[in-house]
Amino acid sequence: LRLKILKKKVLAVDIDGTITLNGWGSIHLDALAKLRSIKDAGNHVVIVTGRSSVEAWLLSIFGGLTHLAVGENGGCITSGDTMHHKMLGNKGDCLRAYDFIKNHFNEEIKEKLVFPRMTEVVLERTFDIPRAQKLLDEEGFNVNLFDSGYTYHVNTKGIDKGSGLLNALEILNVDLEDTIALGDSETDVPMFNVVKNS
């Protein structure tokens, strides 16, 4: 008789619009309780969000989830029982791109007041994002603009929730095939694209 080895599964879950009340703000406590029960059953529950990795890590600590969080749309991973940061993005590139579009657009372009970021810039939704991306590409900036539905995010090219999740899975030493992703916005699509189940 062969025993099947049970592997830990990973549930990668977004915050805003996915586990919040009315899409924004307060955490839906029933959703958090379900996530905790998945973790208590021996699986990993990893927050993957556009918010800061520190906010997500604190939610994982207080919520009883896996002590690892991917924040800033894949730009930073915060993990451990004491905070450890792994920076994947380059905030300097994002700041230079922000300054450039601010100086080349007629619209008022300004940073959104959010929890401080280590690898990205978060902007108010006040300008034409496809036009700005085209201009940045033409000028050779190494960034992508994303619309989360709440804010615009300036991230290093190649950095997104998918690449951040792949780095998190390496840290956890688990297989991609054992991962499920949940989310609700354009910024979650790269995460859906790297997993088989979303």
Language model segments and positions:
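Non-catalytic pre-domain segments flanking phosphatase-related domains
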Residues: L1-V13, D30
